[in-house]
Swiss-Prot record:
InterPro entries: Pep_tRNA_hydro_II_dom_sf, Pept_tRNA_hydro_arch, PTH2. HAMAP family: Pept_tRNA_hydro_arch. Its EC number is 3.1.1.29. This is Peptidyl-tRNA hydrolase. The natural substrate for this enzyme may be peptidyl-tRNAs which drop off the ribosome during protein synthesis. Belongs to the PTH2 family. It is found in: Cytoplasm. Gene3D superfamilies: Bit1 (3.40.1490.10). CDD domains: PTH2. Keywords: Cytoplasm, Hydrolase. NCBIfam families: arch_pth2 (TIGR00283), PRK04322.1 (NF003314). One of its GO terms (biological process) is translation. The gene is pth.
Amino acid sequence: MKQVIIVRSDLKMGKGKIAAQACHASIGSFKRTEEDKIRKWELEGSKKVIVSVNSLDELLEIYRAVKEAGISNYLVRDAGHTQIPAGTITCLGIGPDDDEKIDKITGDLKLL
């Protein structure tokens, strides 16, 4: 079991901004995950992996694949208070779910 957070590298966000957006993605997706998966994930150490994509199009392609696979997810849209315009999609939280299920979609992405 793991959770994957995907960050858009094309936005050139600062480290603090990336951390905040990744946290929003993690919590948002966690809240949409079934209880039995959450318990299993917690028992296995709550593994999280943060990766990046180069564009909004790439992120949305993964988002569609995750939805089609029935994996819990959360698309983060920034509030626009600091570095980027309001409504900008910054991150995607995926899972927690089975490693193999998530890896079929995100396994080729680069670690952040």
